[in-house]
Swiss-Prot record:
Sequence similarity: Belongs to the tRNA pseudouridine synthase TruA family.
BP GO annotations: tRNA pseudouridine synthesis
Subunit organization: Homodimer.
Record-linked InterPro entries: PsdUridine_synth_cat_dom_sf, PsdUridine_synth_TruA, PsdUridine_synth_TruA_a/b_dom, PsdUridine_synth_TruA_C, TruA/RsuA/RluB/E/F_N
Active site as annotated: D53
HAMAP family: TruA
Role according to the record: Formation of pseudouridine at positions 38, 39 and 40 in the anticodon stem and loop of transfer RNAs.
Protein name per its UniProtKB record: tRNA pseudouridine synthase A
Record keywords, A-Z: Isomerase, tRNA processing
Designated gene of the protein: truA
GO terms assigned for molecular function: RNA binding; tRNA pseudouridine(38-40) synthase activity
EC class (word): isomerase
Organism: Xanthomonas euvesicatoria pv. vesicatoria (strain 85-10)
Length: 257
């Protein structure tokens, strides 16, 4: 039987979502599979909606797995969470259709990047906020970011390690706002390239400080040259909010579009 899980995690202590072999360091995937396998009394493999890098967090990562073990969804949720480290929790578990796929059934994915914008670096929230000491104009960042909307070639914002076959993605929404001392960037797209959100944020920061004009983002997009764009923003400010699925899959409201 196939199940879908909503998983929350603090990525600070992990080398990312994906398990990278025996000597690749701790991963969220390896921890989750070990816990599920313990509950199932049999090996369990999971498939996620979107992989995250080292230090990046997940608010509602969605995974699917198959198991012949007879467990109620609540049993999977509580039993698995009890076997996970404190930095990972299963938020919900529901039965899923046999043809549901956590990655390929998703219609969109959402990320949030938050950075503390003040003179002094963060202490209390240093693992969940990035930091920029120079004053940022969030309104200018928001205006500049709108040039990225639609289906475009995002080569200027992909990492050199990106293994995607092409750089075309449909960016459906991007919003930048200031909330007190925090500048927040929320992005939604059909899919993302490796480091795409962090590279976009790194370039928007240069607009926010006034080092680059608002139309620079559009110029970068058209130029498709990663080497002239801004630096990659640090990972700790990034959260994978989660994917969105069509209602036909009958998943919880927070991941249904």
């Amino acid at each position: 039987m196939r199940y879908a899980l909503g998983v929350e995690y603090d990525g600070s202590e992990f080398q990312g979502w994906q398990q990278l072999g025996e000597h690749g360091g701790p991963s969220v995937q390896a921890s989750l599979q070990a816990a599920l396998s313990s509950v199932a009394d049999a090996p369990v493999q999971v498939v996620c909606a979107g992989r995250t890098d080292a230090g990046v967090h997940g608010e509602c990562q969605v995974v699917h797995f198959d198991s012949d073990a007879r467990r109620e969804p609540r049993g999977w949720m509580l039993g698995t969470t009890a076997r996970l480290p404190p930095s990972i929790a299963v938020r919900w578990c529901v039965p899923a259709a046999d043809d549901f796929h956590a990655r390929f059934s998703a219609r969109a994915r959402r990320y949030r990047y938050r950075l503390l914008n003040r003179q002094i670096r963060p202490a209390l929230y240093r693992q969940t906020l990035s930091w920029e000491r120079r004053p940022l104009d969030a309104d200018a960042m928001h205006a500049a970011a709108q040039a990225l909307l639609g289906e475009n070639d995002f080569s200027a914002f992909r990492s050199v390690q990106c293994q995607a076959l092409h750089a075309r993605r449909h960016l459906q929404a991007i919003h930048v706002q200031r909330i007190g001392e925090v500048v927040e960037v929320q992005v939604q797209a059909n899919a993302f390239l490796h480091h795409m959100v962090r590279n976009i944020v790194g370039s928007l920061i240069l607009v926010g400080t006034g080092e680059q004009p608002a139309d620079w983002i559009a110029t970068l997009l058209a130029g498709r040259d990663r080497t002239v764009a801004g630096p990659t923003a640090p990972p700790q400010g990034l959260v994978f909010i989660g994917p969105l699925y069509p209602a036909e899959w009958h998943l919880p409201a927070e991941v249904t579009q």
